[in-house]
């Protein structure tokens, strides 16, 4: 009896049969992998879920994927809505954020339309310095970019004022008003008297010379020149000098005639002959007889004696001051034409405590010299 053995080929086929069936089942269960030629596209984002991109990334994405690398504001809106359906809702909120980022972010540049006309809206493009602000095209990771230097406007440059350098307005320097770092004029700082205590005395600065005093000094020079041309003995010269002494009392406790620089030809009451005084003159010496002559006696010798007092009043003795009332005061006599100077008398000024101008009368009987105040 002969035993039959299976051939080797049949045995190999029997052993491989279960493995091939198992591989077919695994191939049917596994999904097909996407190929290079005709693979499946990734699924669209969920409309209910907000995309994980910032507004700057959305704007940059829309501009980069455009054909001309620039878009209008409405074009940016349309791209975002078509790319991410989540933004179809609540358009007012996110569109305001898009406009806000376009205006304030320096990586977006506004480009006006060509030709202008009735078409509104400008183009927006990316700054060439900010092309690589996203790392390798990943819009979720943004690099920190250094802002490009842009000079400030001309009227806000530090160190320059609105009207010129140094805080001067219109070429005239304003004392106490300086320009700060951005060109604004700081108001002058004054010390208000309402916040001061009376028990704390503060030194007061000297008051500047008023504008009227400057005008009066110029008028005095012109009037003196006119008086010298008319002659020292003319009544108009005395009136001019008397008029100059009147308004000066309202600017200070002392008369301005004393401090004015009188030209030669006009005699001051304290220094005998004319000339600009370098310093305030000393008070007049007490009248007493002088055995020796002075320069101011030359033109005072021809003055008439004083008028007799009215109402029976006794005449004062020689060498003594006698106050004269406005009714009894004798008018000053004009000096002779040969005298070197011109006499004048101060007008009545009630607010002054004392008079700084006087004229000299010569007594022909006794020869004594005394002065009178014309109040």
From Swiss-Prot:
As for subcellular location, the record says: Nucleus
Ranges annotated as DNA-binding: 50-144
Gene Ontology annotations for the cellular component aspect, listed alphabetically: Flemming body; nucleoplasm; nucleus
Q: PROSITE patterns annotated for this entry?
A: FORK_HEAD_1 (PS00657), FORK_HEAD_2 (PS00658), FORK_HEAD_3 (PS50039)
Keyword Transcription recorded: yes
InterPro entries reported in the protein's UniProt record: FH_FOXL2 (IPR047515), Fork_head_dom (IPR001766), FOX_domain-containing (IPR050211), TF_fork_head_CS_1 (IPR018122), TF_fork_head_CS_2 (IPR030456), WH-like_DNA-bd_sf (IPR036388), WH_DNA-bd_sf (IPR036390)
In terms of SMART domains, this protein maps to: FH (SM00339)
| Cross-link Glycyl lysine isopeptide (Lys-Gly) (interchain with G-Cter in SUMO): residue positions | 25
Record's function text: Transcriptional regulator. Critical factor essential for ovary differentiation and maintenance, and repression of the genetic program for somatic testis determination. Prevents trans-differentiation of ovary to testis through transcriptional repression of the Sertoli cell-promoting gene SOX9. Has apoptotic activity in ovarian cells. Suppresses ESR1-mediated transcription of PTGS2/COX2 stimulated by tamoxifen. Activates SIRT1 transcription under cellular stress conditions. Activates transcription of OSR2. Is a regulator of CYP19 expression. Is a transcriptional repressor of STAR.
Quaternary data = Interacts with ESR1. Interacts with UBE2I/UBC9. Interacts with SMAD3. Interacts with DDX20.
Q: What is this protein called?
A: Forkhead box protein L2
Q: Which organism is it from?
A: Mus musculus (Mouse)
Origin organism lineage: Eukaryota, Metazoa, Chordata, Craniata, Vertebrata
């Amino acid at each position: 009896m002969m035993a039959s053995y299976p051939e080797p080929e049949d045995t190999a086929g029997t052993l491989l049969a279960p493995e091939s069936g198992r591989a077919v089942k695994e191939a049917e269960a596994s999904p097909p992998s996407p190929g290079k030629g005709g693979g499946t596209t990734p699924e669209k984002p969920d409309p209910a879920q907000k995309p994980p991109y910032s507004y700057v990334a959305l704007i940059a994405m829309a501009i980069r994927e455009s054909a001309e690398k620039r878009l209008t504001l409405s074009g940016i809106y349309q791209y975002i809505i078509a790319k991410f359906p989540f933004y179809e809702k609540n358009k007012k909120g996110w569109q305001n954020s898009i406009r806000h980022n376009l205006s304030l972010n320096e990586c977006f540049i506004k480009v006006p339309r060509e030709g202008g006309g009735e078409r509104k809206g400008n183009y927006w493009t990316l700054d060439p310095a900010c092309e690589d602000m996203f790392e390798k095209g990943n819009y979720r990771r943004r690099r920190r970019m250094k802002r490009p230097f842009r000079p400030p406007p001309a009227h806000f440059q530090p160190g320059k004022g609105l009207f010129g350098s140094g805080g001067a307005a219109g070429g005239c320097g304003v004392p106490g008003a300086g320009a700060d770092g951005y060109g604004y004029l700081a108001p002058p700082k004054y010390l208000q008297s309402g916040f001061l205590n009376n028990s704390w005395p503060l030194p007061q600065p000297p008051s500047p010379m008023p504008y009227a005093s400057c005008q009066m000094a110029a008028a005095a020079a012109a009037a003196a020149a006119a008086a010298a041309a008319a002659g020292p003995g003319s009544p108009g010269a005395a009136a001019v000098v008397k008029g100059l002494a009147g308004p000066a009392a309202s600017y200070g406790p002392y008369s301005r005639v004393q401090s004015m620089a009188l030209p030669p030809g006009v005699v001051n009451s304290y220094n005998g002959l004319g000339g600009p005084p370098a310093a305030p003159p000393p008070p007049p010496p007490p009248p007493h007889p002088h055995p020796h002559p002075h320069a101011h006696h030359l033109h005072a010798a021809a003055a008439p004696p004083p008028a007799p007092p009215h109402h029976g009043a006794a005449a004062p003795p020689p060498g003594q001051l006698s106050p004269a009332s406005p009714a009894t005061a004798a008018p000053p006599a004009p000096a002779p034409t040969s005298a070197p100077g011109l006499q004048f008398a101060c007008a009545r000024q009630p607010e002054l405590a004392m008079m700084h101008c006087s004229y000299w009368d010569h007594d022909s009987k006794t020869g004594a010299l005394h002065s009178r105040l014309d109040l």
